[in-house]
Design a protein with these regions (language model features):
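Surface segments flanking catalytic/ligand-binding clefts of nucleic-acid enzymes
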Residues: 164-345
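Short gly/ser-rich loop at a beta-strand->alpha-helix junction or flexible surface loop bordering the NTP-binding
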Residues: 1-185, 324, 331-345
Length: 345
């Protein structure tokens, strides 16, 4: 069995769902440079030893080893009917049962490979994002772009809550990868999706709010991509008597119209939090921002969210599409963005 094995495509996405860490992982120097891998002494010493380097290892056994490792991390076994792998060139492709081998068509960029166990690598999320177009819908890939560039992590394979974490990639990082690999499959579509992705979402519902605005009209969104997330507004000295905070951040902000959209989840029901929210809205309105609040209840009901999105469109100077066909698409998008919502977001 040729080593290392490189997990890619949907298998890589499954891995990143369950194992996305808060700190950078060990980057491989090259795909098949054994010396460079051996030189990574310190990180390699802590890598799991799976037995992939055993002499005479059968491909079927390697499949079992990799599948068992992924299951141990939390990937459901039913998601592993095959394991996606990546090689540099077509002549390196093999088709043992259980593996689905993909060809990059050039030396795989070493900076986008991560060592996860001895003899096992995984493509990073920049590369995985481009590959995602081969199995994700455009809405799913749009959401994935926000998640990669977010300040939280949500495991789509678990019913657990999201966790806050540092931002691992920027939209600029993903665009740079697409530009460097434009001839690779999926890069053109990924670059188009990234025109609607923005950095720094702090929660899944903040991502959901942004997607309802930026997604194409054909997907049920408002089709308005020129927004910012968590736009900082410093309180001027002459308004500081109105607020305790020295600055505020607007969840979703459209600079051209001065429209701000806030998502208030269940945590905003706390009395002290409600008072702070009221103070914040007062100051932002006094500063000339057009502020609109979305709630979990509105996201949970089609007509309530439709009316709220009409208000947002009106504030932004956009056409309000009230046709039955658009409302159907908008509701499909609403159901998509809240599909992991447990009522507490």
């Amino acid at each position: 069995m040729d080593l290392p094995i490189v997990l890619s495509h949907k298998t890589a996405w499954l891995y990143h769902n369950v194992a996305r860490p808060s700190e950078p992982l060990s980057r491989a120097s090259s795909l098949y440079d054994e010396d460079s891998l051996a030189n990574e002494a310190e990180p390699t010493a802590s890598l799991p030893k799976l037995g992939l380097d055993a002499k005479g290892l059968r491909a079927s056994t390697a499949v079992e080893i990799v599948a068992d490792y992924l299951v141990s991390l939390g990937v459901p076994r039913e998601e592993l009917d095959h394991i996606d792998t990546l090689v540099n060139f077509d002549f390196e492709r093999s088709t043992p049962a259980g593996f689905r081998c993909h060809v990059f068509g050039a030396p795989v960029p070493p900076g986008h490979l991560i060592e996860v166990a001895e003899g096992l690598l995984v493509v990073d999320e920049a590369m995985c994002f481009v590959q995602a177009g081969s199995w994700m819908s455009e809405s799913e890939q749009l959401e994935y772009g926000y998640e990669i560039c977010a300040r939280y992590h949500l495991n789509h394979l678990s019913t657990g809550d999201y966790i806050e974490m540092g931002q691992r990639y920027t939209v600029a990082d993903l665009i740079a990868y697409c530009n460097e690999n434009r001839s690779r499959q999926g890069a053109v579509r990924a670059a188009a999706v990234l025109k609607r992705v923005h950095d720094g979402a702090r929660s899944p519902m903040e991502t959901a709010t942004a997607i309802m605005v930026v997604a194409k009209r054909s997907q049920g969104g408002l089709g308005y991509a020129k927004i910012e997330l968590n736009h900082r507004v410093d309180v001027p000295n002459e308004f500081k008597y109105l607020a305790k905070a020295g600055y505020f951040e607007i969840d979703v902000y459209a600079p051209a119209s001065g429209t701000g959209i806030e998502y208030n989840g269940s945590d905003h029901l706390d009395k002290q939090r409600s008072a702070s929210d009221a103070e914040r809205m007062t100051v932002l309105s006094a500063l000339g921002f057009r502020m609109i609040v979305l709630t979990g209840t509105q996201f949970a009901h089609q007509l309530q969210l439709h009316r709220a999105m009409n208000a947002i469109a009106l504030a932004m100077g956009l056409k309000c599409d009230r046709s039955e066909a658009f409302q159907k698409r908008q509701n499909d998008l609403r159901e998509f963005v809240i599909r992991h919502w447990d009522g507490g977001l």
